[in-house]
Amino acid sequence: MRPQLALARHRATTAHLCSAYPFAAELGLGIGGVHMGTNLLTGGGGFAFDPFEAYAQGFVTNPNMLIAGEPGVGKSATAKTFIHRSVGVFGRWVAIADPKGEYLPLAEALGLTVVKLHPGGATRINPLDAGPATHVDAAEQVRRQSEMLVALLGSVLKRDLAPVEDAVLGGALRVLASSGVAHPTLADVAHLMAAPTADMVPTTTTDADLAKAVESIPFALGKLLDRSLRGMFDGPTNVGIDWHGPGLVIDLSAVHHDHEALTLVMVAATAWLQTLMATPGGPRRIQVLDEAWALLG
């Protein structure tokens, strides 16, 4: 007995049927890269993606990715799949800011260095550190450090820095850059901001005026140096990093449930990671910011 078609017959014009027959699957974006899975919206073809290739071929204007969705839809699984295949197959270098501590099994599988930070701990990273980025000149380094500190202090103070505070902060960083200190720290900045001098900002007249204008800054830095977040960013970097390895994970799970602390730690840790990303030469690099909302304050 011949099998019967379960669906009712349908009659249509060739103008419509040509889009459905012969059955075909879309080729996707037409670029190579990491195989991410099956594209269920385009006939079941495979879907591959590589932000570097997409940028090189003009599909995107910058190689950034945003993975968004409701809880439980697979955002983290998608990110981990992309990282695992990018590093394991394509030899990319990866730096991950991990607020939940959920990338540790992936780090073990790929041989990534794990840096675990927690208040009162012995492991420290210096957000002002240039890392291996020795190609950056002093002026550019001061600019990067200033941008990071403005974001960090703004988050602590819950306001934008006043123009005079911003100016004195930049002056303090320039003083440190010209002083010959190899690796200035947040403690060095706090020391200068506690007793600023008029030569740090030539447009001012007295040291006392400056000290009054920036009196909140040393106390704001104190949150990272000697109060609730001490032991994370209050000294030179003492982490052994294999610069020729596949990458690293910064485990921030110790402060994940403290929204204010997580924002500060993410800003500081991300600034440190960006110095690594800017180093010329070597493999193509990927920076992953899980829970990136924390950077928005």
Please provide the spans of the model-predicted regions.
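Short, flexible loop motifs at catalytic/binding sites
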Residues: D50, A54-V73, S86, G91, ...
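Basic- and hydrophobic-enriched, low-structure N-terminal and domain-boundary segments
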Residues: M1-A68
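P-loop NTPase motor domains
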Residues: Y21-L41, L104, E108-L112, P127-G297
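Conserved beta-strand position immediately N-terminal to the Walker
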Residues: M65, V94, L248
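Walker A/P-loop NTP-binding active-site region of P-loop NTPases
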Residues: V73-P132, L169
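Short His-Asn-centered micro-motif
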Residues: G69, I96-P99, L289-E291
